C-alpha cells in the first residue's frame, strides 16, 4: 500500500508544482528504503523536472540501478526545460553507450527539442538519421518536432520535406512551418500556409505574429494581430501581447502601442513581468522615456530585464547620468546585471565622454560579476575612447582584444578618425577595411569615400567605388516610417509616387529656400557616391526618405506635437543638417531613430551633438 500512496502524492506534487512537498516525500521514500522501486524513481524524476529542479531529477536518475525509457525521457525533458540542452545530449550519449537502451519516441522528441534549443543542426541531423532507421520512423509527433527543429535552424526546405511526409499533421507541425517562414521573412509563404491551416488557435496566431516581429516585419505583424482581434480569438496567454508590443517598439508606433497597453490592462496581464518589460522597451523606443519610467515604477516585481530595459532606454536617449544612477539603484537592490546591462552603460558613457567611468564598468563586468566581455562590449569601449580623442588607445584595444575585429569595430575607429581630424590614421584604417573585409554596411562605404575625399585622394575614392561594385553590394533601400493619427506611413528614398507628393515637394522646397537664406544651407553632395553631376546629386538628397517622412508629418500631424521617424539606415550628414534647420524653422521637435541611435532635433540642435 505504501508505493501506491507515495505515487499518488508525488503525482499531486507534479500537477501542483510543489517542490518542497516533493522533497519531503522523497526523504520519506529514502528512509523507508523503497526509493529503488522503478515506478517511484521514475515519478520522482518526472516530479523534479515539472518543478524545475533538473539537478535533483538528474541525481535521482543517476542513482537508479535499473533505468527504463520512462526515466530516460523524463530526465532529458527536465534538462531541456531547465535550458540545459547541452547536458541533454551528453546524458543521452552516456546512457545509450553504458546501458544499451535504444531511444523510443519520447526520447527522440526530447533529443530533437534539445537540438532545436541549441540551434545545433549537426546533432539534429544525426538524431534524424537514427530516427529514420528506428522502429519509430513514422511517429508523427517526432516528425513534428523535426519540422520545428529545422525551421528554427533556418533550414526551411528540410523542414518542408519532413512536413510533407506527415500524413496527419498536427498543430505543432503546421505552426512550426508557419513560424519558420515568418521568421525568415518569407511573408507570402507564411501567410499562404496560415490561410489553409485547418484549425487556427491562439498558439498559431502567436507564432505568425512573433515570426513577423522577429524578421522585422512589424506592419505585417500588426495587420495579423488586427485580423486576430476581428476573429474574436480569446487571448488567454500574454505571449501574443508581448509580441505585438515588440512590433510597436520596432515601428516606434506610440499611438498603437498605447492602445495595446490599454488592452493589456483590460485583460489583466499588466502584472506580468515580461509584459511590463516589453512595455518599458516599447515606450523607450517610441521616445517616451517618461512613460517607460512610469511602467517601471509601478512594477511590484522587477527582474534584471526590467532594470536593463530602462537603463538602455535612458542611454539611447542621451540620459547618461540617469542611466548610471539607475544602475547604482539596481545594484543596491541586489539585482545582478547581465551582459546587455553593461552594453547600455558603456554606451551611455560613450555619448557623454565619461571615459574613466566607462573603463571602470568594463573592468567591473569580469571582476565583480564574472561576465566575459563580448565583441560588442569591446566595440562600445572603443567607441568611447574614439569619441574622447584617445585614438591610439582605441587602436591598441583592437589589437589586444581576444576577438578578431569585425567591420563595425574598425568602422567605429574610422568614424572617430574623421571626427578628430586624424587624416593619416583614417586613411590607413580605410585601406585596411577595403583590403580585409567584404563590406556590408552602407554607412561604411560612405565613411570610406569621405575619408579619401577629405585627403583629395580621388583615385582611392574611385578605387573604393570600383571595389564596391565588384563586391556586388546590395544595400537595403532606405526607407523611413512616420506615425500620424494612428496610421503608419512608409517612404522610400527617391519615392515620388505618394498621393501627397506635390504637397510634400512644395513644403520641402519652401523649407529648403528658407534654410538657404536663413542658415546659409548648401547641400553636402559628398554623401552621394554615385558618379553624376551636382544637380542630380542634390535631387537625390532632396528625396531622401526621412525628409519626405518629416514633411508628411508636418502636413498631417496634430500641430505642435513631436514628429517621430524610424529609418532603417543611418541618417546621412546632409539630412542631419536639414532636420536641425527644419526643427528650428517650424519650432517642432523631430525625433529620429536610425540604425545607430536616437536623434532629438529641437531648436536647431540635435541630442547627438553631431556625432553618431
Swiss-Prot record:
Family designation: Belongs to the PPR family. PCMP-H subfamily.
This protein's UniProt keywords: Mitochondrion, mRNA processing, Repeat, Transit peptide
Span of the transit peptide along the chain: 1-24
PPR repeats: 37-71, 72-103, 104-138, 139-169, 170-204, 205-235, 237-271, 272-302, 303-337, 338-373, 374-408
InterPro entries: DYW_dom, E_motif, Pentatricopeptide_rpt, PPR_At4g14850-like_plant, TPR-like_helical_dom_sf
Region (Type E(+) motif): 486-516
Any one of the GO CC terms: mitochondrion
Function comment: Involved in C-to-U editing of mitochondrial RNA. Required specifically for editing the mitochondrial NAD4, MT-CYB/COB and RPL16 transcripts.
Record gene name: PCMP-H13
Subunit structure: Interacts with MORF8/RIP1 and MORF1/RIP8.
Main subcellular localisation: mitochondrion
Presence of keyword Membrane: no
Region span, Type DYW motif: 518-612
Keyword Endoplasmic reticulum belongs to the record: no
Chain intervals for the UniProt region annotation (Type E motif): 409-485
Annotated GO MF terms: RNA binding; zinc ion binding
Compartments where located: Mitochondrion
Record GO biological process: cytidine to uridine editing; mRNA processing
Lineage: superkingdom: Eukaryota
Protein name: Pentatricopeptide repeat-containing protein At4g14050, mitochondrial
Amino acid at each position: 500500500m505504501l508505493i501506491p500512496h507515495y505515487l499518488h502524492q508525488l503525482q499531486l506534487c507534479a500537477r501542483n508544482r510543489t517542490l518542497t512537498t516533493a522533497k519531503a516525500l522523497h526523504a520519506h521514500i529514502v528512509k523507508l528504503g523503497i526509493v529503488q522501486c522503478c515506478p517511484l524513481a521514475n515519478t520522482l524524476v518526472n516530479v523534479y523536472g515539472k518543478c524545475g529542479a533538473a539537478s535533483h531529477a538528474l541525481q535521482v536518475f543517476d542513482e537508479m540501478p535499473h533505468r527504463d525509457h520512462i526515466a530516460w525521457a523524463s530526465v532529458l525533458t527536465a534538462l531541456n526545460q531547465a535550458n540545459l540542452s547541452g547536458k541533454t545530449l551528453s546524458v543521452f550519449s552516456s546512457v545509450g553507450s553504458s546501458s544499451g537502451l535504444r531511444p523510443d519516441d519520447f526520447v527522440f522528441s526530447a533529443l530533437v527539442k534539445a537540438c532545436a534549443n541549441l540551434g545545433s543542426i549537426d546533432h539534429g541531423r544525426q538524431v534524424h538519421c537514427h530516427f529514420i532507421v528506428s522502429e519509430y520512423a513514422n511517429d508523427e509527433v517526432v516528425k513534428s518536432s523535426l519540422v520545428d527543429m529545422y525551421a528554427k535552424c533556418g533550414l526551411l526546405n528540410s523542414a518542408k520535406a519532413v512536413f510533407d511526409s506527415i500524413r496527419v499533421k498536427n498543430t505543432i507541425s503546421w505552426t512550426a512551418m508557419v513560424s519558420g517562414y515568418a521568421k525568415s521573412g518569407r511573408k507570402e509563404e507564411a501567410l499562404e500556409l496560415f490561410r489553409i491551416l485547418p484549425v487556427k488557435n491562439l498558439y498559431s496566431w502567436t507564432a505568425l505574429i512573433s515570426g513577423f516581429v522577429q524578421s522585422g516585419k512589424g506592419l505585417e505583424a500588426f495587420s495579423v494581430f488586427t485580423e486576430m482581434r476581428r476573429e474574436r480569438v480569446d487571448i488567454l496567454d500574454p505571449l501574443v501581447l508581448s509580441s505585438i508590443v515588440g512590433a510597436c517598439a520596432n515601428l516606434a508606433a506610440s499611438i498603437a502601442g498605447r492602445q495595446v497597453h490599454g488592452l493589456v490592462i483590460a485583460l489583466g496581464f499588466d502584472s506580468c513581468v515580461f509584459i511590463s518589460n516589453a512595455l518599458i522597451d516599447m515606450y523607450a523606443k517610441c521616445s517616451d522615456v517618461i512613460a517607460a519610467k512610469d511602467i517601471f515604477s509601478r512594477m511590484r516585481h522587477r527582474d534584471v530585464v526590467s532594470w536593463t530595459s530602462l537603463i538602455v532606454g535612458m542611454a539611447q536617449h542621451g540620459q547618461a547620468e540617469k542611466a548610471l544612477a539607475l544602475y547604482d539603484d539596481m545594484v543596491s537592490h541586489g539585482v545582478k546585471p547581465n551582459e546587455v546591462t553593461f552594453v547600455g552603460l558603456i554606451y551611455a558613457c560613450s555619448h557623454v565622454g565619461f571615459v574613466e567611468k566607462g573603463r571602470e564598468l568594463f573592468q567591473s563586468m569580469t571582476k565583480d560579476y564574472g561576465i566575459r566581455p563580448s565583441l560588442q562590449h569591446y566595440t562600445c569601449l572603443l567607441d568611447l575612447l574614439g569619441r574622447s580623442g584617445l585614438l591610439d588607445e582605441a587602436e591598441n584595444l583592437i589589437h589586444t582584444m581576444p576577438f578578431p575585429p569585425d567591420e563595425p569595430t574598425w568602422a567605429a575607429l574610422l568614424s572617430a578618425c574623421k571626427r578628430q581630424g586624424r587624416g593619416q590614421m583614417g586613411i590607413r584604417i580605410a585601406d585596411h577595411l577595403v583590403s580585409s573585409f567584404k563590406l556590408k554596411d552602407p554607412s561604411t562605404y560612405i565613411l570610406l569615400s569621405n575619408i579619401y575625399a577629405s585627403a583629395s585622394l580621388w583615385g582611392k575614392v574611385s578605387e573604393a567605388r570600383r571595389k564596391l561594385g565588384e563586391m556586388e553590394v546590395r544595400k537595403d533601400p532606405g526607407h523611413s516610417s512616420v506615425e500620424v493619427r494612428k496610421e503608419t506611413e512608409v517612404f522610400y528614398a527617391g519615392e515620388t509616387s505618394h498621393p501627397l507628393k506635390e504637397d510634400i515637394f512644395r513644403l520641402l522646397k519652401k523649407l529648403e529656400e528658407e534654410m538657404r537664406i536663413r542658415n546659409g544651407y548648401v547641400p553636402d553632395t559628398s554623401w552621394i557616391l554615385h558618379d553624376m553631376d551636382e544637380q542630380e546629386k542634390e535631387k537625390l538628397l532632396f528625396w531622401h526618405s526621412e525628409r519626405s517622412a518629416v514633411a508628411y508629418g508636418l502636413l498631417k500631424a496634430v500641430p505642435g506635437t513631436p514628429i517621430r521617424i524610424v529609418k532603417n539606415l543611418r541618417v546621412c550628414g546632409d539630412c542631419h543638417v536639414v532636420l536641425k534647420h527644419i526643427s528650428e524653422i517650424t519650432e517642432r521637435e523631430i525625433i529620429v531613430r536610425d540604425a545607430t541611435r536616437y536623434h532629438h532635433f529641437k531648436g536647431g540642435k540635435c541630442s547627438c551633438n553631431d556625432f553618431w
